[in-house]
């Protein structure tokens, strides 16, 4: 039996390679028969896909070559994936869920992303005990970690990078800002800019929800409207926006566009002259530069997570041993007393 993870993050791969890895991993969701053959009977997987990481957590009873095959597929993209099994897999997911492996150490969004990835997987397909246990305990320990360990407010945030970038491009608090998608990252950036005096914030979402900002209906969305800054932060691609084209985006000169999506909403073959397009690679580079300057240290909390992971791993091993013994007993033929 093999319980493990294979993946890449912003450390091992640029945005282009992460996008390609996401497409490869999504094939397991798109092709049920293929994934069943790949992981074998009673095997399954959970995909954790975020702006900064693409990971597949898997369990397989029969295919002991799963790890090497996954590594080969992702390595073919030119990336250098990491892999962990058993206790190391537990420790990795616990560290990820706590936010201590994030680009911005201690950020809280990852807890929700891990939870949504787990819920999606168990809704879409049957998961084995191993994956249920791994994710449930990671979510529990991640929550406990935040309640027990005092983390200082991040020195660098995505909001601060966005604000500084807008300043560099001559944007003011009077400019008109459009947020496409009511996602975590869009809300966080909007809240940060609002606190800095930006008031002309407009959201466009597929969902009909009540929010503390002005809104524009999707049917009325036009990229020729005088939006000075546009933030793409939904899970949609370019084909979901009928009016999305380079011509329309460039219809407002000096427009700044942030594409927070991975894979990107759109890719440009050449750099446009009249607009500025920035993606998550840009955000990552800026954050890492600022972190190097601030010399933020976060390693001191990791032993806490390693200890929690070992404790839950030992519980998992005991439960697996008990399950195996029970299955063995039920599979033995009963002796007839003559």
From Swiss-Prot:
Listed pathway(s): Porphyrin-containing compound metabolism; protoporphyrin-IX biosynthesis; 5-aminolevulinate from L-glutamyl-tRNA(Glu): step 1/2
EC number(s) stated in the UniProt entry for this protein: 1.2.1.70
Residues involved in NADP(+) binding: 181-186
Assembly with partners or alone: Homodimer.
Binding site residues for substrate: 50-53, 102, 107-109, 113
Reported function: Catalyzes the NADPH-dependent reduction of glutamyl-tRNA(Glu) to glutamate 1-semialdehyde (GSA).
Catalytic site: 51
Gene Ontology terms: biological process: protoporphyrinogen IX biosynthetic process
Entry text on domains: Possesses an unusual extended V-shaped dimeric structure with each monomer consisting of three distinct domains arranged along a curved 'spinal' alpha-helix. The N-terminal catalytic domain specifically recognizes the glutamate moiety of the substrate. The second domain is the NADPH-binding domain, and the third C-terminal domain is responsible for dimerization.
PROSITE patterns named among the record's database cross-references: GLUTR (PS00747)
Annotated InterPro entries: 4pyrrol_synth_GluRdtase, 4pyrrol_synth_GluRdtase_N, GluRdtase_CS, GluRdtase_N_sf
Classification lineage: Bacteria, Pseudomonadati, Chlamydiota, Chlamydiia, Chlamydiales
Entry keywords, A to Z: NADP, Oxidoreductase, Porphyrin biosynthesis
GO molecular function: glutamyl-tRNA reductase activity; NADP binding
Catalytic reaction list: (S)-4-amino-5-oxopentanoate + tRNA(Glu) + NADP(+) = L-glutamyl-tRNA(Glu) + NADPH + H(+)
More details: During catalysis, the active site Cys acts as a nucleophile attacking the alpha-carbonyl group of tRNA-bound glutamate with the formation of a thioester intermediate between enzyme and glutamate, and the concomitant release of tRNA(Glu). The thioester intermediate is finally reduced by direct hydride transfer from NADPH, to form the product GSA.
Residue(s) at site: Important for activity: 92
EC category name: oxidoreductase
Name of the protein this chain belongs to: Glutamyl-tRNA reductase
Family: Belongs to the glutamyl-tRNA reductase family.
SUPFAM superfamilies in alphabetical order: Glutamyl tRNA-reductase catalytic, N-terminal domain (SSF69742)
């Amino acid at each position: 039996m093999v319980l493990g993870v294979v993946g890449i993050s912003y450390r091992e791969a640029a945005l282009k390679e992460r996008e390609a890895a996401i497409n490869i991993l999504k094939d397991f969701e798109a092709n049920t028969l293929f994934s069943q053959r790949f992981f074998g009977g009673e095997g399954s997987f959970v995909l954790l896909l975020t702006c900064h990481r693409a990971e597949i957590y898997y369990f397989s009873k029969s295919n002991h070559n799963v790890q090497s095959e996954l590594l080969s597929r992702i390595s073919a993209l030119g990336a250098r994936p990491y892999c962990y099994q058993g206790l190391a897999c537990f420790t990795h997911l616990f560290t990820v869920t706590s936010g201590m492996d994030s680009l911005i150490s201690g950020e809280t969004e990852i807890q929700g992303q891990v939870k949504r990835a787990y819920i999606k997987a168990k809704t879409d397909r049957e998961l084995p005990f191993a994956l249920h246990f791994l994710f449930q305990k990671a979510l529990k320990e991640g929550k406990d970690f935040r309640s027990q360990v005092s983390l200082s407010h991040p020195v660098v945030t995505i909001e601060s990078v966005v604000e500084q970038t807008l300043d560099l491009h001559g944007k003011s608090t009077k400019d008109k800002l459009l947020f496409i998608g009511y996602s975590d990252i869009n809300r966080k950036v909007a809240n940060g800019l609002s606190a800095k005096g930006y008031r002309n914030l407009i959201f466009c979402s597929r969902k009909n929800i009540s929010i503390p900002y002005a809104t524009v209906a999707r049917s009325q969305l036009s990229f020729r409207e005088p939006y000075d800054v546009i933030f793409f932060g939904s899970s949609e691609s370019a084909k979901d926006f009928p009016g999305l084209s380079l011509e329309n985006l460039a219809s407002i000169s000096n427009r700044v566009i942030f594409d927070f999506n991975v894979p990107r909403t759109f890719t440009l073959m050449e750099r446009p002259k009249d607009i500025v397009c920035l993606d998550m690679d840009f955000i990552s580079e800026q954050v890492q530069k600022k972190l190097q300057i601030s010399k933020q240290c976060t390693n001191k909390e990791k032993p806490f997570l390693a200890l929690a992971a070992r404790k839950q791993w030992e519980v998992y091993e005991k439960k697996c041993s008990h399950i195996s013994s029970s299955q063995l007993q039920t599979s033995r033929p009963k002796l007839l007393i003559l």
